Amino acid sequence: MEDFVRQCFNPMIVELAEKAMKEYGEDPKIETNKFAAICTHLEVCFMYSDFHFIDERSESIIVESGDPNALLKHRFEIIEGRDRTMAWTVVNSICNTTGVEKPKFLPDLYDYKENRFIEIGVTRREVHTYYLEKANKIKSEETHIHIFSFTGEEMATKADYTLDEESRARIKTRLFTIRQEMASRGLWDSFVNPREAKRQLKKNLKSLEPCADLQTKVSHRTSPALKTLEPMWMDSNRTAALRASFLKCQKK
């Protein structure tokens, strides 16, 4: 699974996922299913944001190419992928500026058009089951929830899907592609079956036993990739980075 993740996802996403896991003392080489899940979730968050801007009249528009110097503000603030301290700093700044209620848990995005935080979910199970779990955890009507599955299903708060149909179709297609690529490598069953995943985890732990003395200290240096997540007006570098974040899986 680890090899698949490094082949399938953009290096920027892989780096962010590794950093997030190490922040919680988790090892991507051992908890490979979680590694894959985090990368998938990060990519969906990037794709959710990509191409969506607000113009000088505060109207929401979709721009796939054009003048990089145009005064276009990104519609979505990406919170997922930042270290916790920076993420809460961004959330507090948004709340102070907009007056929206501060969430109890870190959300994934902020929508400047609808003035609400968004929690993105990607599930291997039934969408309604995962949606209810998210809603029960968050317990806030202020945070919008949007759930995607690997089978093309989705569910959102009050059936408000935020994005246009084409943008959501891109996300669904990417998730289906990831599922197909996993299946072709014999990885899908362990990804969705907890019992099989536990067996694989034990196997991974056993294979890494001789390396138990390896350094595990977490680095607190800011990843260069995080610079692409800073609030900013539209520029060609960020657009290119976001475009790269949903490259198709590379074949072996």
Swiss-Prot record:
The record marks 195, 198-199 as: Important for efficient shutoff activity and nuclear localization. It is found in: Host cytoplasm; Host nucleus. It comes from the Viruses. The record marks 202-203, 206 as: Important for efficient shutoff activity. The keyword GTP-binding does not apply. Keywords: Decay of host mRNAs by virus, Eukaryotic host gene expression shutoff by virus, Host cytoplasm, Host gene expression shutoff by virus, Host mRNA suppression by virus, Host nucleus, Host-virus interaction. Belongs to the influenza viruses PA-X family. Plays a major role in the shutoff of the host protein expression by cleaving mRNAs probably via an endonuclease activity. This host shutoff allows the virus to escape from the host antiviral response. Hijacks host RNA splicing machinery to selectively target host RNAs containing introns for destruction. This may explain the preferential degradation of RNAs that have undergone co- or post-transcriptional processing. Interacts with host RACK1. The probable endonuclease active site in the N-terminus and the basic amino acid cluster in the C-terminus are important for the shutoff activity. The C-terminus acts as a nuclear localization signal. The C-terminus is recruited to host protein complexes involved in nuclear Pol II RNA processing. This is Protein PA-X.
